[in-house]
Design a protein with these regions (language model features):
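Helix-coil modules at protein/domain termini and other flexible surface or pore-lining loops
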Residues: 2-5, 9-27, 37, 41-51, ...
């Protein structure tokens, strides 16, 4: 029988998720962004997840590649791109860290579509 001589620590990751937040009965893009960030923060804080950073995302123009504001407003309804950043400790792999992040944040936010954008290993 081979006995390991040392325990290798599992890596830690910084995970960035993108979410699509719908805001109804809104007049301006700025108001939609404020409401989306506020509502997301409130849901995260209710679950004691104030360690998750929330900010507005952006889209890239499919034609020219220039960044566009992460909000689309039509008929008093806005779709706001939000970014959620969380540190995941002791994950088995990048993929595992992404699944943990989506599950953890997804449970707090409810029916908000999430997608992993970026995963970085941290010290």
């Amino acid at each position: 029988m081979i006995v390991p001589t040392s325990h290798e620590a599992m890596p830690n990751f910084n995970v960035l998720l993108e979410g699509a937040w719908l805001v109804r009965d809104i007049k301006t893009e700025d108001d939609a962004i404020g409401v989306a960030i506020s509502e997301a923060g409130k849901r995260l804080n209710q679950k004691k997840m104030d360690f998750v950073e929330v900010e507005m995302g952006q889209w890239d123009c499919p034609e020219c590649g220039d960044p566009l504001a992460g909000v689309f407003l039509v008929a008093s309804t806005a779709l706001v791109a939000l970014l959620f950043e969380i540190k995941i400790f002791n994950a088995e792999s990048e993929e595992h860290a992404g699944r943990i992040a989506k599950s953890t944040i997804g449970k707090a936010l409810g029916a908000i579509p999430l997608r992993v954008l970026e995963i970085d290993t941290i010290g």
